Amino acid sequence: MFVYLIQWEEKKMLNFNFLNNMRHWGDGLAKVEHEMKHKHDDFRQALNPNTMEAAIWLVEELKKTLEENYMKEEQYNILVLNSWLGIPLVPLLCENISVGELHLVDIDNEALELSKVFNKHYIAEEYIKVNHWNLDIPFAFDELNQLKVDIVITMGAEQMYPLKDLKTANKHAIFAVQNSNVIEEMYGINCVDSEKALIENAGLKNTYYTGKQKQFYYDWN
């Protein structure tokens, strides 16, 4: 005997309408082709399934938390650490959350220059103020702590030193922090293996949401 019960639950979908933004991607890819050929692989990695899945998951849960626990009528100012090319995270944020100002921080200045092109729609046509900061994050906490932001996001916390000293100028700022356990990679200097370890690593006191997703890490050796 087999009994199967299906229970339906409503799921709010994110807005994936990137078409307005994608018309600038041709310019971005032309810049890669003619000026930064070595960035082809960065573009590919930015849109690989693991990165896309992680970004969508982060924005889904962040949006849900903001709607349920952090009601605010005006727009949000958001700080993104290790923003890289800004895709897919910037379009996901701008299409699904009311963004007033974005601070995108990365040590890779070429990636930031490409981000300005790939995300031009939100800057030039949606009039979202986007600031690109070329900073080495562990040594820039003094500057970053002066920013008055509502949300701090990092999808690659394993690539940075612990964020305990990052406070921002808003003591009520929400932190959305993703990390991984890919310690085999040389850039994984700050990996964790549990949600509890990540909370301690980031110096967080109160949490609205914790979760874990399994992804596949491909070792080609």
Residue ranges with predicted function:
Residues 5-73, 114-146:
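S-adenosyl-L-methionine
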Residues 73-85:
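Conserved class I S-adenosyl-L-methionine
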Residues 85-98:
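Conserved SAM-binding loop of SAM-dependent methyltransferases across substrates and taxa
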Residues 101-106:
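Conserved SAM-binding motif I beta-strand of class I
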Residues 108-110:
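Conserved SAM/SAH-binding beta-strand->alpha-helix loop
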Residues 149-163:
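A short SAM/SAH-binding and catalytic strip from SAM-dependent methyltransferases
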Residues 162-220:
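C-terminal substrate-binding/active-site "lid" region of AdoMet-derived donor-dependent transferases
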